[in-house]
A protein has these predicted regions:
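Pre-Walker A (pre-P-loop) alpha-helix and adjacent loop at the N terminus of AAA/AAA+ ATPase modules
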Residues: 1-12
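Conserved P-loop NTPase "ATPase switch" module shared by AAA+ and STAND
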Residues: 43-46, 62-81, 85, 108
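Conserved nucleotide-binding/hydrolysis micro-motifs of P-loop NTPases
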Residues: 47-50, 73-76, 102, 106-112, ...
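Loop/turn-to-beta-strand initiation segments
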Residues: 38-40, 63-67, 96-103
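Walker A/P-loop
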Residues: 11-42, 55-61
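C-terminal alpha-helical "lid" subdomain
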Residues: 151-213
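Conserved AAA+ ATPase "SRH/arginine-finger" region at the nucleotide-binding site
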Residues: 123-138, 145-159
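Conserved catalytic/switch belt of AAA+ P-loop NTPases
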Residues: 57, 77-126
Length: 213
């Protein structure tokens, strides 16, 4: 994800993987790191995709660097907004602006939900060209020049995240007790993820503050 200060060479990036693994947090971290150097983020939602070219036209000559950011991006079978996004990424005859980059995060590797019939490429009376349909849907993800996978940590890595966060927030609980409670916490809070670790530490910090009152 680094390299922004060197220029926007890789214009389109997709961060995909399991929920709670830090995709959105990474984007926020980039903004915090480079804000003073002129980085700004514009968050776009699916219903706004048809207006993205107009947005880019308005910001391409400004003295800032912009990330157009789409969080938790995915499309259902009936949605067509992905076609607008493909058109934006591909661009027209004009040169793509050097100060605009597109980032998206998603829990889906292919962004667009596939039907079982799509995967099997089974044609029926309603879709005589199912193979073409499959390729059209899957082609969106290939427009992202850089695709970065975020996987869940294993138990050892999860515990290391908990230790690191505990030290950062000044948690005083003994380590054995801390890790035992963390293991119990993740069972009912989404499993072994960075998000679960952060939520657990937030809970512990709040509990310790209450005890000190």
């Amino acid at each position: 994800l680094a390299g922004i200060e060197m220029g926007f060479v890789e214009l389109v990036k997709l961060l995909f993987g399991d929920a709670g693994t830090g995709k959105s947090s990474s984007i926020k971290g980039i903004l915090n790191q480079y804000y003073d150097q002129g980085l700004r983020i514009i968050e776009a939602y699916k219903h706004q995709f048809q207006d993205l070219n107009e947005v880019i036209a308005q910001i391409k000559n400004r003295n800032y660097r912009f990330i157009i950011y789409m969080d938790d991006l995915s499309f259902e079978e009936f949605e067509i907004e992905y076609k607008y996004l493909k058109a934006v990424i591909e661009g027209g005859l004009e040169k793509k602006p050097d100060n605009v980059l597109i980032y998206a995060t998603s829990n889906r590797r292919n962004l667009v939900r596939e039907r079982a019939a799509d995967k099997l490429e089974i044609a029926d009376e309603d879709d005589l060209h199912s193979s073409d349909t499959v390729q059209e849907k899957l082609s969106l993800v290939y427009r992202f020049g850089v695709r970065i996978y975020f996987g869940k940590p294993d138990k050892k890595q999860f515990q290391e995240i908990v230790r690191t966060l505990a030290a950062r927030y000044g948690v005083t609980m003994p380590e054995d007790e801390l890790l035992l409670k963390a293991n119990q916490w993740e069972l009912s809070h989404g499993g072994l993820t960075g998000r679960a670790a952060q939520q657990f530490i937030d809970y512990i910090v709040g509990t310790e503050e209450e005890k000190r009152k």
